[in-house]
């Protein structure tokens, strides 16, 4: 994901406007360290398998249903609001893809719930009602009644987990806030989280965990997020089974390229290797930390949907940067996918790990799926 500098600067200009608009109700929701996530149910239930010996699991950053629109927040575009027609078409395409792959449990990132930019559609409920999933859980990472920049307005976006089976417990675990921002910017900024659920998979003590870690921090926030994610799944009972994943905004330990400025920059931006002061590097340079290459090494102690030997193969890259060639209908080339940011881990074995790069027109991230094989009793 590339940082849009206008978005970052916008928060620093909100002082006067924000103070004028403040009332008895806070503009931005601040969350407790741990609290209940929001539970959902489909409007109609579908039949489920009673005693599965395996599950197909998938993670997908769906980019709040914006597909490949050149957006002002994560690409070089200037779009801020979608029409309701655009949103529905994009969600229909996402639902069609999900219904074709048929994962049993789906980890989602960047799902909008009644946000102005996506037509105030509750995308968690919409996807439940337009797929075969029966239950869902949601944890917001950015819930603001009003963001006064660029007409953005109301925003509620976060992580979600969809399941065939009932979700018996769901909690939102707050991740640390960035410390490289002024107080006002931090107030209006994202509050990322870990969504931890317990799912009533027959004959299993089963957990699903989803997160979306920071993309643009220049301090050690990303390290804190990933360490907390690792600690969360490590604390799950060793007799239980878990899947854990999401958009970690981190490269594998074996990535040979860590500077994506030339791929990510907008036309007016310059890649000058000023990693500390040039804002283009906030989301495009993956070597800010003293040992950033090792950020995910502990997670790879677990089974991975895409194993370590294959993780850096180009067919397993999961992120693609929007570029002007996309104005040409059907454009895709060999460099379309340029890095791996999306992962699934488990404490039992995976098979048939797949990166779904053919879904290139549905988001700026490719889904990742794998079959989870339960051990024999």
Model-predicted segments: where are they?
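Conserved S-adenosyl-L-methionine
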Residues: 136-143, 170-176, 354-359
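N-terminal, active-site-proximal structural segment of metallo-dependent hydrolase catalytic domains
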Residues: 22-156, 376-377
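Beta-strand-turn-beta hairpins that frame and shape the catalytic cleft
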Residues: 48-57, 155-169, 183, 188-211, ...
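Surface-exposed cleft-lining segments at the edges of enzyme active sites
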Residues: 78-83, 111-113, 177-186, 212-219
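Sec-dependent bacterial lipoprotein signal peptides
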Residues: 1-22
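Solvent-exposed loop/turn segments at secondary-structure junctions
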Residues: 62-65, 111-115, 141-145, 167-168, ...
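Metal-dependent phosphoester-hydrolase catalytic domains
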Residues: 25-45, 233-243, 250-377
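Active-site beta-strand/loop signature of hydrolases that rely on acidic residues for catalysis
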Residues: 55-62, 93-120, 162, 197, ...
């Amino acid at each position: 994901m590339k940082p849009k500098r206008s978005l970052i600067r916008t928060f620093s200009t909100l002082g006067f406007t924000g103070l004028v608009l403040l009332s008895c109700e806070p503009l931005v929701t601040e969350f407790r360290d741990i609290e209940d996530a929001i539970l959902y149910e489909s409007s109609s239930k579908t039949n489920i398998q009673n005693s599965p010996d395996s599950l197909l699991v998938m993670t997908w950053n769906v980019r709040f249903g914006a597909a490949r629109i050149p957006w002002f927040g994560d690409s070089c575009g200037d779009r801020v609001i979608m029409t309701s027609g655009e949103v529905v078409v994009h969600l229909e395409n996402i639902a069609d893809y999900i219904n074709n792959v048929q994962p049993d449990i789906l980890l989602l990132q960047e799902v909008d719930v009644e946000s102005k930019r996506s037509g105030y559609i509750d995308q968690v409920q919409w996807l439940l009602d337009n797929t075969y999933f029966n239950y869902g859980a949601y944890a917001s990472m950015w819930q603001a009644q009003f963001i006064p920049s660029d007409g953005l307005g109301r925003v509620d976006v976060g992580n979600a987990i969809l399941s065939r089976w009932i979700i018996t417990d769901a909690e939102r675990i707050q991740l640390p806030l960035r410390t490289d921002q002024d107080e006002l910017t931090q107030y209006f900024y994202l509050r990322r989280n870990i969504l931890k659920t317990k799912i009533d998979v027959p004959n299993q003590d089963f957990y699903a965990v989803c997160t979306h870690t920071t993309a643009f921090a220049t301090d050690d926030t990303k390290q804190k997020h990933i360490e907390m994610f690792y600690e969360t799944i490590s604390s799950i009972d060793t007799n239980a089974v878990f899947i854990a994943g999401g958009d970690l905004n981190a490269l594998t330990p074996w990535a040979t390229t860590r500077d994506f400025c030339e791929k990510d920059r907008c036309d007016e931006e310059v890649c000058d290797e000023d990693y500390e002061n040039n804002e283009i590097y906030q989301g495009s340079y993956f070597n800010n930390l003293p040992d950033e290459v090792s950020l995910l090494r502990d997670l790879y102690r677990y089974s991975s949907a895409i194993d370590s030997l294959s993780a850096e193969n180009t067919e397993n890259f999961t992120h693609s940067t929007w570029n002007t060639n996309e104005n040409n209908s059907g454009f895709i080339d060999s460099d379309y996918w340029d890095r791996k940011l999306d992962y699934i881990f488990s404490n039992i074995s995976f098979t048939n790990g797949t990166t779904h790069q053919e879904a290139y027109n549905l988001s700026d991230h490719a889904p990742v799926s794998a079959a989870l094989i339960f051990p024999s009793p």
